[in-house]
UniProtKB/Swiss-Prot annotation:
Keywords: Hydrolase, Protease, Zymogen. Initiates the rapid degradation of small, acid-soluble proteins during spore germination. It comes from Clostridium acetobutylicum (strain ATCC 824 / DSM 792 / JCM 1419 / IAM 19013 / LMG 5710 / NBRC 13948 / NRRL B-527 / VKM B-1787 / 2291 / W). GO terms for molecular function: metalloendopeptidase activity. Gene3D superfamilies: HybD-like (3.40.50.1450). This is Germination protease. The gene is gpr.
Amino acid sequence: MNSVRTDLAVEAREMYCEKTENGDNGVRVDTKRIEDIEITTVDVLNDKGEERIRKQKGTYITLDIPKVTLYDSEDIEEISKVFADELSKIISKAKLDSSMTVLVVGLGNWNITPDSLGPKVIGKLMVTRHLKKYIPDSIDEGIRPVCAVAPGVLGITGMETGEIIRGIVQNIKPDLIVCIDALAARKMGRVNSTIQIGNTGISPGSGVGNMRMELSQKTLGVPVIAVGVPTVVDAATMANDTIDIVIEKMKGEVSEDSKFYSLLKAIDTEEKSQLIYEVLNPYVGDLLVTPKEVDMIMETLSKIIASGINIALQPALELSEINKYVN
């Protein structure tokens, strides 16, 4: 049976809860709201939780942000600070001090707009490792050494991303790795409006069926934090969501006592999803869909994520000071 594509832990848990009455066994969920941003923390506590939602044991924090194509500078700063606070909570578990090196990796293909989030973020980061090495007297002691790389993809370099990162890790020996990647979602509403942070590493391309070498503490020997935004949704998922909206609207317009209402209510969600996939697949294959404004959206999201990472990695500096280094 085809499984719905999603890289988001919060969606994986929702899918499990749709199939069972007890969705919390082995999984703890906390939700809070900061103004217009809803923050959901999913903790996969044990093997049971891992099996149920098919996500590795660890912490996954999801930020649902307002869906706007273009944010003004105040909006970007506000969202960046909230994101930085949540990222800092994950980073704190690695017990870093200001002298420890962080490697930031921008995964993805810069030639494909929805997959270019990682490389775009790298271009907006405050990188300091070279400054700490070559002009240490000109740099404040509280500034952490940060280095960054956008390794490209197998089709461009001929090398597995994991091989490239492993070689870099062996040479510069970072104390923490932060990976940024574009993800896939199972709901249209989460495309380009959700940021996920996790401390279990990442498998580049897994959301779209391109399984590459896992980047994690197990494979690299260094703690790996993954930051991602879903930028695409499967065409079958989009069709399924559209039909769900139609069904819900029809339910509201017919009497609950009618046979037609009973028929609508009896439609099995999983069977419907599978039917849509089987009908569409011969015609469109593995088609992925992204909004037409994706160029502007990627620019905005990369600013938000880069600013948030800069704030989280350089707690001794104000954002205005960070921007002097970046701009």
